[in-house]
Design a protein with these regions (language model features):
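A structural motif
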Residues: 62, 125-128, 178
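N-terminal binding-site loop/beta-alpha segment at the start of enzyme catalytic domains
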Residues: 1-96, 113, 153, 168, ...
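Acidic (Asp/Glu)-rich catalytic clusters
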Residues: 26-28, 78-93, 120-126, 195-199, ...
Length: 388
């Protein structure tokens, strides 16, 4: 079963799950976080059913709601929460674990607090449970932009600048506007720099990143967890309806993988349920996943995965592998969000630079030196290379 966004069907006859049966993972601060987060990423699609889908998710037992200002629907999610309260699905928003994200365009220190206030007002709450910086640099793109969109003002990760943003995020925690803080789309190099330079009570407790059976990110996840940072995976179902700018012929669909299909057949379960079970059970159930759907049966199924262990140890091993030639698993480093629309000029158009830590700068002065060297090199290249 491929979860297609166009298929919308809400059915009140489907019984909710008991939220207390959903597995939770402890954060470094001692709080518990539901591993299953209902996603609201829909920024390039019509929002006419997102309110109903989110309210239905709450009715069916979801208690972790994942939002972001970049999705352009915090107001819609806020109305869904109010609707859930009116309908009696929850007594108040305090029953929810709400994750929000600071958008790249609001990373200037003066913009962080106003961005949070906008989020709180849109959601209709005084506090959220988790606030993440969405990406580690302030590069932006326009909604619905094309694959080849580039922002000439984009820059690589500059640690000096990020620390200034992070300090403002920490102030939000001190002010009681957010309970816990975390990151999203960080790499090992950027996280090492952050952990080096912040106090113990300023450390992120959660990092959200792309993870699914064909992009398992095992080494990176182990690094984060060694530092006490819980990992949650977005694109958990391969996001078959992601924007066109993030769809390329090189991509593979997780639910078309023969191993996923074979295990689904063995269990008599859906392909989506197998993919999410991998996300819920891997690494001793220490992380989480983000998933969304617009049918009541799928919404319930996606949550039910977090209430039991669907996969046997043998089935889990077939997906994960064990680092041996005999059992490599199915990880194919199949990244679906390349992030090419965030590239800076010095990256020369190679989206891999976003993820391989080859252009991580400590200071603004260091970036200016790097930029000048790059520009000089390209000037010589243009002057000496045959142009045909």
């Amino acid at each position: 079963m491929t979860q297609k966004i166009e298929q919308v069907c809400f059915d009140n006859s489907i019984q909710p799950l008991d939220p207390s049966t959903v597995h939770q993972v402890p954060l470094a601060t001692g709080r518990m976080m539901p591993v299953a987060a209902f996603g609201t990423f829909h920024s390039d699609w019509a929002q006419n059913y997102m309110e109903e889908a989110t309210a239905e998710a709450i009715r069916l037992g979801w208690r972790h709601i994942d939002t972001a200002r970049a999705y352009e629907n915090e107001e819609v999610v806020g109305e869904a929460i109010r609707r859930a309260i009116r309908e009696g699905y929850i007594a108040s928003a305090d029953e929810l674990f709400i994750t929000g994200k600071l958008w790249n365009g609001h990373m200037a220190p003066k913009d962080v607090a106003p961005a949070m206030d906008t989020t709180l007002q849109a959601l209709g709450v005084d506090q959220i449970d988790m606030y993440l910086n969405h990406w580690p640099w302030p590069n932006v793109h326009t909604p619905g932009c094309a694959t080849d969109h580039r922002n000439p003002g984009a820059v690589p990760y500059i640690h000096e600048a990020f620390l200034e943003t992070w300090a403002e995020i920490c102030k939000l925690k001190q002010a009681g506007k957010v309970v816990d803080i975390g990151t999203s789309n960080h790499t090992q190099a950027t996280m090492k720099l952050l952990l080096r330079d912040v106090a113990q009570d300023e450390r992120p407790v959660y990092n959200q990143m792309e993870m699914h059976p064909l992009l398992q990110q095992t080494e990176l996840r182990r690094y984060f967890e060694s530092e006490g940072i819980v990992c949650g995976g977005y694109m958990a179902l391969g996001s078959p309806n992601r924007p066109g700018r993030d769809t390329f012929k090189e991509h593979r669909a997780d639910m078309m993988d023969p191993t996923i299909q074979a295990i689904a057949a063995e269990l008599g379960e859906s392909l989506a349920k197998v993919a999410l079970a991998w996300a819920a059970q891997r690494e001793n159930k220490s992380g989480g996943y983000v998933a969304m759907a617009t049918r009541s049966d799928w919404i319930a199924e996606n949550l039910r995965v977090a209430t039991d262990d669907l996969l046997s140890a043998e089935q889990l091993l077939r997906i994960c592998g064990d680092d041996t030639p005999q059992n490599p698993g199915i990880d194919a480093n199949n990244r679906l969000i390349w992030g090419q629309v965030f590239l800076w000029p010095e990256a020369d158009g190679d989206w891999r630079i976003l993820w391989d830590d080859s252009q991580v700068l400590e200071t603004r002065a260091g970036y200016q030196t790097f930029k000048a060297s790059w520009e000089a090199h390209h000037k010589v290249q243009l002057e000496t290379t045959f142009q045909g």
